[in-house]
Each structure stands twice: as C-alpha cells, then as structure tokens.
Amino acid sequence: MNLFFLFIIPTILAVKPFRSFNNISLIDNGNVESVRAVVIDYCDIRHPNNLCKKHFEIDSYWNDDTDCFTNIGCKVYGGFDIIGGHTPKVGTVCRLKKGENKFGYCNSKGNCVERDFKESFGISIKIKGISNKGDDEPACPQYKNTWINYGKCNEPYYCGTNHGLFYANKRKLDYFPTDGEKCNSNNIPYAVCYLGRCHTTGGFFSEFGTIVKNVEIVTLSDGKNSSRRGKHKNLPTSKVFDSYSIYDIDPKNWKIEDDDKDVTVHENTLDPKSDSRLC
C-alpha cells in the first residue's frame, strides 16, 4: 500500500494545473487599442524541443512586459500551464514604459530599447499561431495606413523561451520605413525588414507564410504545414524556403484565396524563380 501511495501521489502532483495565467485579461484598455499575449508552445516538458507542435494558442502574457528577463508562460502538451524560461531572446517585443503604449525590443543586455520600425523588431501582427521555426526579422508595411497590423517572426524552439510577444495596434500606424513604400513595385502590401533592407513578401518572409491585406487574424506557417488561418501551401514541385538559404519567388506569382475562413497562398511553380530581394 505504501508503494502505491509513493507512486500515485507524485503522479497526481505532476499533472496538477497551474492557474496563475489562466484568468489574466489579454485586452489592454489604454489609450491605444492593443492586445498583449504570448504565443504558447505545446511541447514535452522533458525535452521542450522534442514534441513541439505547429500550433500555438494565445492565452497568457508576460507578467511584466517591460522586463526583458521576466519569466513567460508555456502550455505543456498535457494541457496544464507552467512558468518556464527566464531570458527572452534578443529581439522580443517589449513595452518601453509601464502604462504607455510605446514598444521596443530586448537587446543583448536585457534592456528594452526603442528603435524606428525599419531597424527594430517591430510592432507585431495579431496572430493566433506561428511555426516552430522562424526568424527574428519583422514584417514591415509597404504603405502608410494599411488596415492590417504587422508581423514579427520568432524562433520558439524551446518551451519557456518561445519569444512571441505580440501586439495588435489598429490606431498608431506610423512606424514605417521611408523606403518601404517604394520597395515593392508589384503592389504587394507587405514586406520584410532583413539586414536593414525592405524585401518583398515573395522573398524571405514567405518561409513563414504571407501576410494578406484585409485579414485581421492570420497565422504563419513554415511552408510545410498549414495552420488554422493564413495557410502557406507549397505545391509538390515547389521549393520550400528554409532558415539557412534564401529562395525568392516573384510576388506576382502568388495567388491569394480568401473565403473568410482560410487564407491560402499557392505558389505558381510554372513561372521561373526570380530574385526580388534587392527590390
């Protein structure tokens, strides 16, 4: 009997849910309309990178989004919450000052610093998912006052160090690089800031899915697996973009389908690949 209790009690304790984040509101009722949330990773606590899934949920946020060294929440595959991680990666979006809707990014010293949009890691698009493979460069808008917000790619490889702190901001749409408006001659509304340059959505950012105009909630995909919204479907003969090599496809070869349920991006593999990264 003693052996039974020695086994069963630790088992029960191991799966007991932590409720610390569950009832926290995601809505910031400040002077700027915004949503504050961490993209939650589903993974195996024994080896966080082992069973990480493609889909993440927004159901908690940093307990202090001005602190670049704060712990962040992580939802484990079993369905309960833990507090995991300690050092968000350089580039995580952070709030510059408590009570103010001004954002920057965490630098290598752990400070939240302000930069203009071209050089920073950006205000991020309101999304409900991201792949477990990403890049730290943000999407940059092509035109002023575009309706959709902006995206930040992340690398949530480990439970507790998934760096997806996202903000949706519909009012303050003025974080634009001056050369971003003339970057894309094909009128594709979004591009990615990469190595100080503004690149078209058909380029590097396509690895993570394409942000489509007039879609409020999208998800980003790694090009191999589709998520709930903002699907990026690669045809069998297409080249899958990866983090190590940049393959570029002219944005005019992308077809957007929006049935108000899914946004699917199809690659036209009949057209030759072209390098549009230099705009």
Swiss-Prot record:
Residues 1-14 form the signal peptide. Posterior glands which appear to be connected with the stylet through a series of ducts. Keywords: Disulfide bond, Neurotoxin, Secreted, Signal, Toxin. Residues 15-27 form a propeptide. One of its GO terms (cellular component) is extracellular region. GO terms for molecular function: toxin activity. Contains several disulfide bonds. This is Toxin TxP-I. It comes from the Eukaryota. Part of a complex mixture of neurotoxins which P.tritici utilizes to capture prey. It has contracting-paralyzing activity in insects. The keyword Disulfide bond applies. The keyword Disulfide bond applies. InterPro entries: Neurotoxin_TxP-I. It is found in: Secreted. It comes from Pyemotes tritici (Straw itch mite).
